[in-house]
Amino acid sequence: MAMTNIPYGSDQAIRIQSAGLFAAVMQRNTILNRLTGPMPMQSDAENAIRVQSSNKYPIVLCKDLSKTAGDEITFDLVNPLGGKPIMGGQNAEGLGRALSFSQDKLRINQTRYPVSAGDAMTQQRTRWQLRSLARAAAEEYMNRLMDQISLVHLAGARGFHNNIEWAVPLQSDVDFASILINPVKAPTKNRHYISTGSNIEPISASGNDISIATTDVLNSDVVDGIRTVLDSMAMPPSPVIFEGDKMASDSPLRVLLVSSENYTSFVQSTNFRTLQAQAMARSQTAGGNPLFMGDAGIWNGILIVKMPKPIRFYAGDPINWCGSFYTETENTTDCVPDSFNVDGKRVFAVDRSILLGGQALATALGMNNKTGNPFFWSEKELDHGDKLEVLIGMMNGTSKIRFNQDYGSDGKRVTDQGVICIDSAVKIAGV
């Protein structure tokens, strides 16, 4: 009986491997991926060119098979209606309120990462299969890169924490803008706060120093302040509705991503084991969603979760912020006070926490012309077959969702749709 044989490096093999890669990336076991809504079932999507995940999650995924590298994808917001109703027998004809829309867009581009799998003699000297190791390492790197790009866009800053685990370079790097594809935008004025140690207040500066002290930490009082601000502001980020969460309507949630140091500061201010138990109980009504498990806790309707890397600013580092509700113009010269250093050493820093509601971030996926999906593998033999290079790639783009929203008598304000940033002081671990 004839057997099907798919040759090494053939187009069919690449398509099969790339489809497997796409599935693996979509199911990667990371915090940020769990904040992405599930894609529609194939039966619902097979006839659609543009497929979008649930907008009830913080990260909205759009798979647009009509797009190619460098193209733009647009998305719209229907502005809320205001004004008074018409009562009794008063004339209503011809007085209908006009719908108005705000629009945002993002670009997609090709990202590639090659890994050398060595040559024939390198393979001879080791018992490890270098080709398999190269593929695994490349996939891990691309997963890390995708999560960090999402984190930086949500935070509106890269920060200055840096070690080998960062795949996204510092903003001063010449390739930073091209790697991020879309501009990294500081939080809008109505979405940027700082801790006072007992509450939050809009970010401000004095004498080129951000108005924050080393005692302005994140604690339970500050999280209560966040909830109070959410309840009192016009058009706050909408609650997150996780798939299968039976309590979503009765007990709405937002998600607060915090650094490890901010997490420790919060834990020390309250009985966190009770909060963990509440999160575990909530997971039972949300289909066992792993986001609620482990270190997560629920406080005052806010699910507190550790972020994968800190967005951190040290003494003397600038924190960009918007001084007007009506423009995206950023103040770029105000810095963390020198008092965050002690005897010339970095002892304290400012870490950014990220509060997420629905539709905070958009990730668009394009189509590779060889594989038919956004992710692809390539393997190439060099030097007459002596050496092997493995390449992983993706066709995508990520951007924070931002609209010029109509606030009625307050006019149209530039607004980050589903994310609020809170800056607070931390003591650097290990110092």
Which sequence ranges carry the predicted segments?
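N-terminal "assembly arms/tails" that initiate or stabilize quaternary assembly
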Residues: 1-106, 406-431
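Short, surface-exposed, charged/polar-biased interaction segments
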Residues: 96, 136, 152-155, 159-166, ...
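A broadly tuned preference for mixed-charge, low-complexity surface segments
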Residues: 50-51, 126-138, 166, 306-326
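Intrinsically disordered or highly flexible coil/loop and linker segments, enriched in small
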Residues: 27, 31-32, 36, 40-49, ...
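Outer-membrane beta-barrel and related beta-rich outer-membrane complex signature
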Residues: 87-89, 161, 165, 402
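Long, contiguous amphipathic alpha-helices that act as assembly "spine/axial" helices in icosahedral shell
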Residues: 75, 102-201, 247-262, 384-394
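Short acidic, glycine/tyrosine-flanked loop/strand segments centered on an H-E-D-like triad
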Residues: 96-126, 352-372
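Sequence/fold signature of self-assembling virion shell proteins
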Residues: 2-29, 33, 175-431
